Structure formats: C-alpha cells, structure tokens
Amino acid sequence: MPKAKGKTRRQKFGYSVNRKRLNRNARRKAAPRIECSHIRHAWDHAKSVRQNLAEMGLAVDPNRAVPLRKRKVKAMEVDIEERPKELVRKPYVLNDLEAEASLPEKKGNTLSRDLIDYVRYMVENHGEDYKAMARDEKNYYQDTPKQIRSKINVYKRFYPAEWQDFLDSLQKRKMEVE
C-alpha cells in the first residue's frame, strides 16, 4: 500500500524536556513486582489495590481490619449483626497463604563445608588435644586452642546426630586397630 502523502519532518531532540524527572515519574508510576506468588497469580491489573485485596479476603489497612476497642462506646449486638460481611471471591489465595504460614520454618543456619571438614580432621587426628590442634599444619588461620574448641562446640550444637555418628565411627576404628 502506498504511503499517504503529506509533510514528514525529521525527529528533533527535545532539549526543553527534563529527562531526569520523566524517568523518575515513570519509575514511580510503574507497578512493583508482587513477591508473593499466590497474590501475584490472582491479581487483576484492571482493578485497584483495595478491590484486589478485598476479593482475596485480605485487608488493605490492618488498623481498620482489627481496630482498637474503644472503652467508652460499646457496640450493641444488633449493630454487629447488621454489618455486612464482605464477599470473598478468591478464597483460595487466603487458604494458600494460611497453609504456607502453618508450615514449619526451615532451619536457615548451617555451617560451611570447609568448617565441618576442618573440625572432623582435627578431632580425627588429635582427639581432645586442643594444643596439638593449634600446632597442626592444617590450622591455616592459626586458631588458638580456645577458638578451635569453640568451633568444635558449634559443630556439636548444630549437628548433634552427625557428631554422635562421627564419634561412633572413630570408636570403631580404634577397636579395629587394637
């Protein structure tokens, strides 16, 4: 199809436009990424935040959701019954969030593999002799006997079952040698 006739002018750079402000405003208006996957999948971009959260059964403002009780004015039982319950159209989001919250928390603190190997090596070769451990050539960081003892105690505290298995294996080795 032929091009429509008319004046075409070249694009000129707009020097009068403040690009810094334009970019800042664009960043402010851009919708943030919703971290919670349950909420993100149920989100309707055509609706407002308040409408979306109301459909999911979540509160926009926690202060309004659970207000402080006022001691002077007591609500009558009739008033409480007359208040309409909000309709929850997406209850599965609320159920998923509650199920996720009820799961046991993962143990986040662990020791590095290097520290575990270091402790095992020291105990394997020196037993309870911390001074000999401090003089060992594998003591790269030149830990003092007390520092080595504390590292071993940390290992015992973090992995008590593994520590017991390790000690049992050492006992078996000693029995085999004798």
Curated annotation (Swiss-Prot):
Residue list for modification N6-acetyllysine: K90
Chain intervals for the UniProt region annotation (Disordered): 1-31
Residues of the signal peptide: none
Keyword check for Phosphoprotein: yes
UniProt-annotated location(s): Nucleus, Nucleolus
GO cellular component annotations of the record: intracellular membrane-bounded organelle; nucleolus; nucleoplasm
Keywords in alphabetical order: Acetylation, Isopeptide bond, Nucleus, Phosphoprotein, Ubl conjugation
UniProt superkingdom: Eukaryota
InterPro entries: Ribosome_biogenesis_Nop16
Modified residues (Phosphothreonine): T8, T144
Molecular function as annotated in GO: RNA binding
One GO BP annotation of this record: ribosomal large subunit biogenesis
Major localisation: nucleus
Protein name (record): Nucleolar protein 16
